[in-house]
């Protein structure tokens, strides 16, 4: 039987919905990803963020390799019902595969002619040590 709450979400033509992940407390935007129905259902069941990896074509439990799990406190649906917001606690403060707190670590500075993207957040942990080959 279809779950009514899942049917309320306006899934795109690929069966996906965009997801914004925001940290509880700081309100920092940590990352952007996609979910399919299974990912959203698993997120609710586990209380941890599960996404759909478009590159791997499979469910991706955030932190499955790095240990940087996202504990979900709240799930919201926007006014058009086509974007999901997760409010999370980010384990070990690292959300980005680059070893940074947020995936949004580049800030535009300057004007239209001479502007450029500047890195404004430090690497908290070397990614090679996060994703080192496991025995």
Swiss-Prot record:
**Which is one GO molecular function term here?**
zinc ion binding
Q: Which residues bind Mg(2+)?
A: 78, 80, 82
Q: What's the catalysed reaction?
A: 1-(5-phospho-beta-D-ribosyl)-5'-AMP + H2O = 1-(5-phospho-beta-D-ribosyl)-5-[(5-phospho-beta-D-ribosylamino)methylideneamino]imidazole-4-carboxamide
Pathway listed for it? Amino-acid biosynthesis; L-histidine biosynthesis; L-histidine from 5-phospho-alpha-D-ribose 1-diphosphate: step 3/9
EC no. given is 3.5.4.19
**Which residues make up the binding site for Zn(2+)?**
79, 96, 103
Cofactor binding note from Swiss-Prot or TrEMBL:
Binds 1 Mg(2+) ion per subunit.
One GO cellular-component annotation of the UniProt record comes to: cytoplasm
Q: Which organism is it from?
A: Cupriavidus metallidurans (strain ATCC 43123 / DSM 2839 / NBRC 102507 / CH34) (Ralstonia metallidurans)
Its main localization is cytoplasm
Its family? Belongs to the PRA-CH family.
Tell me the organism's taxonomic lineage.
Bacteria, Pseudomonadati, Pseudomonadota, Betaproteobacteria, Burkholderiales
| GO biological processes | L-histidine biosynthetic process
**Top-level taxon of origin:** Bacteria
The family database entries (Gene3D superfamilies) matched by this protein are listed as: Phosphoribosyl-AMP cyclohydrolase
In UniProt terms, what function does this protein have? Answer: Catalyzes the hydrolysis of the adenine ring of phosphoribosyl-AMP.
Gene behind this protein: hisI
Report the subcellular localization.
Cytoplasm
What are the required cofactors?
Mg(2+); Zn(2+)
InterPro entries in alphabetical order = PRA-CH, PRib_AMP_CycHydrolase_dom, PRib_AMP_CycHydrolase_sf
Which PANTHER family does this UniProt record tie to the protein? HISTIDINE BIOSYNTHESIS BIFUNCTIONAL PROTEIN, HISTIDINE BIOSYNTHESIS BIFUNCTIONAL PROTEIN HIS7
Q: What is this protein called?
A: Phosphoribosyl-AMP cyclohydrolase
Oligomeric form and interacting partners: Homodimer.
What is the top EC class of this enzyme, as a single word?
hydrolase
* Keyword vocabulary terms for this entry: Amino-acid biosynthesis, Cytoplasm, Histidine biosynthesis, Hydrolase, Magnesium, Metal-binding, Zinc
């Amino acid at each position: 039987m279809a779950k009514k709450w899942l049917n309320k979400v306006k899934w795109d033509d690929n069966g996906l919905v965009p997801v914004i992940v925001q940290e509880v407390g700081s309100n920092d935007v940590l990352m952007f990803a996609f979910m399919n129905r299974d990912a959203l259902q698993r997120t609710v069941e586990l209380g941890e963020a599960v996404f759909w990896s478009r590159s791997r074509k499979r469910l991706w439990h955030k932190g499955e390799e790095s240990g940087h799990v996202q504990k979900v406190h709240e799930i919201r649906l926007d006014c058009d019902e086509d974007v999901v917001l997760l409010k999370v606690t980010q384990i070990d403060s690292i959300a980005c595969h680059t070893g940074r707190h947020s995936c949004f670590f580049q800030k535009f500075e300057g004007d239209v002619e001479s502007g450029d993207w500047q890195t404004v957040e430090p690497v908290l942990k070397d990614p090679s040590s996060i994703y080192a080959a496991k025995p």
